[in-house]
Regions:
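C-terminal ends and interior cores of transmembrane alpha-helices
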Residues: 81-101, 320-345
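Juxtamembrane intracellular "pre-TM" segments in multi-pass secondary transporters
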Residues: 1-8, 213-251
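Short amphipathic helix-loop junctions that connect adjacent transmembrane helices
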Residues: 23-46, 266-283
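Hydrophobic core of transmembrane alpha-helices in multi-pass small-molecule transporters
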Residues: 90, 97, 102-121, 339-365
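Central cavity-lining transmembrane alpha-helices of secondary-active solute carriers
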Residues: 48-68, 157, 288-300
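Helix-to-loop junctions at the C-terminal end of transmembrane segments
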Residues: 61-75, 296-310, 336, 409
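Cytoplasmic membrane-interface "Motif A"-like loop-to-helix N-cap segments
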Residues: 70-86, 306-321
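Multi-pass alpha-helical transporter architecture, strongest
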Residues: 8, 203-211, 331, 419-443
Length: 443
């Protein structure tokens, strides 16, 4: 491979390395495990929502400032190393969540430390995208990265289900006891998801750190000076955002639809475990289906993005995901879309698997095109700051989905009604796209 190709593949490997935090911890393995330990689906959904919402507020406050500092200092890699360490620490410590000594606040603390590490590392690697290829190839490269990341999540999930995660019988999907002598009665197979995610990230970030070289910035400032210079400029950037109508509208739109999508990811496994009574294995299969469709449609969406631009791709996927959010409310163990079913019926399971496939397809393509749309809206010399604002947009209201789900679930005592805020968030995001120019404001 040429140096340029290695750089692109190294960048892809960040998606491959980091995706298991979303796939295994946030959605399909560790989230449902917390539900099973707490024993009350509604209470677990509410606690999970409060924890994720708090982490989102921290990310929202710091992302733009750190992005501006990185642009001034030319030091994205330093931040990626730092937040990678938080990722690994947070994931590893989830091993200490045994059912016999389960401290929900300890678990949420380290889960959120890892989540913060992942989100900040993502901000800095996303900002490298425009340096990798010509503008015409942005959609394809972004889509390929998302697809490669989803494949990484699938492989990690398959390893988890086949070799480690014990089902209700105490055996894995292969019908064997968890490997390495892990004790299924203490849920050690399932708890090993934390160390697995930590080791996976550390191993597969090696190509990234070896092959992705940051261009030398001739006017780079020391970190201290960069911090002092970045804050006034960031305030100026925020003050003039309303005058940059297209960028402002896009940040606001993505703020809502990405929050809704993240709500689907975070609560999908918890919802299935609580409403349908699925085991960790069932939720894992659901995750494989969603990740497979996510990989395929991130790749297809990237091709479509390169041909017609990111805006039509974003609109299409937000519409699809809105319809899915509506459909989820009407799937339970007792009925499917209003039609009563017997207690042994497989229709609720089949229906939710189909919805999971649609969530994966829409989510993969939507996230890929959202990344390229941000590149089109941003000023090239302020790219990391722009992706910091993008992270701010994703997190400034990121507490709305989890906290509103937590509140509505608490008030109604129903996990089904608890997910209805996602519908409203998708529709707000769709409406705000009306003011977004496909290629951003003219220079």
């Amino acid at each position: 491979m040429t140096a340029a190709q290695k750089r692109i593949w190294g960048w892809y490997f960040f998606d491959w390395a980091s995706q298991p935090y979303n796939t295994l911890l946030l959605t399909f393995i560790f989230g449902p495990y917390v539900v099973s330990v707490i024993g009350d689906g509604s209470a677990a959904q509410a606690i999970w929502g409060y924890g994720i919402g708090t982490a989102g507020l921290i990310i929202a406050v710091l992302s733009p400032l750190l992005g501006a500092v990185a642009d001034k200092s030319g030091g994205r890699m330093v931040f990626i190393w730092l937040f990678s360490a938080l990722y690994v620490l947070g994931a590893w410590m989830l091993w200490y969540s045994a059912p016999s000594d389960f401290n929900v606040w300890f678990v949420m603390l380290f889960f959120c430390i890892g989540l913060i590490g992942m989100e900040f590392a993502t901000t800095f690697t996303n900002a490298m995208l425009p340096d990798l290829c010509p503008r015409a190839d942005l959609g394809r490269i972004s889509g390929n990265g998302w697809a490669f990341g989803y494949l990484g999540g699938i492989v990690a999930l398959i390893i988890m289900l086949l070799l480690l995660a014990e089902g209700t019988s105490g055996r894995t999907l292969l019908g064997i006891a968890p490997i390495f002598g892990l004790n299924p009665e203490a849920r050690e197979g399932t708890r090993s998801v934390g160390p697995l995610v930590a080791i996976w990230y550390a191993l597969f970030m090696i190509p990234f750190f070896l092959w992705v070289k940051e261009p030398r910035k001739t006017d780079a400032l020391p970190i201290g000076q960069a911090l002092r210079a970045a804050w006034p400029e960031l305030k100026l950037t925020l003050a003039r955002l309303p005058q940059q109508r297209s960028l402002f509208a896009y940040l606001a739109s993505s703020m809502f639809y990405r929050d809704a999508l993240n709500g689907m990811y975070v609560f999908g496994g918890i919802y299935a475990a609580g409403v349908l009574g699925w085991s960790v294995t069932n939720v894992g299969i659901f995750g494989i289906i969603a990740a497979l469709t996510g990989a395929v449609f991130a790749w297809l969406g990237g091709k479509m993005d390169s041909q017609v631009g990111p805006k039509p791709v974003i609109i299409l996927n937000v519409v699809v995901l809105t319809l899915v959010a509506i459909a989820v409310v009407f799937v339970s163990r007792d009925s499917v879309f209003g039609v009563p079913v017997g207690p042994d019926s497989i229709l609720p399971d089949v229906g939710f698997y189909i919805l999971g496939a649609l969530i994966g397809a829409g989510g993969g393509s939507l996230q890929s095109s959202s990344r390229t749309m941000m590149v089109r809206q941003a000023e090239p010399e302020r790219m990391t700051e722009a992706f910091g604002l993008y992270a701010l947009a994703g997190k400034a209201t990121s507490f709305i989905a989890p906290l509103s789900i937590g509140v509505v679930t608490d008030l109604t005592g129903s996990q089904q009604l608890g997910v209805t805020p996602l519908i409203v968030l998708f529709l707000i995001g769709l409406f705000l796209l009306l003011w977004v120019k496909p290629d951003g404001e003219p220079a």
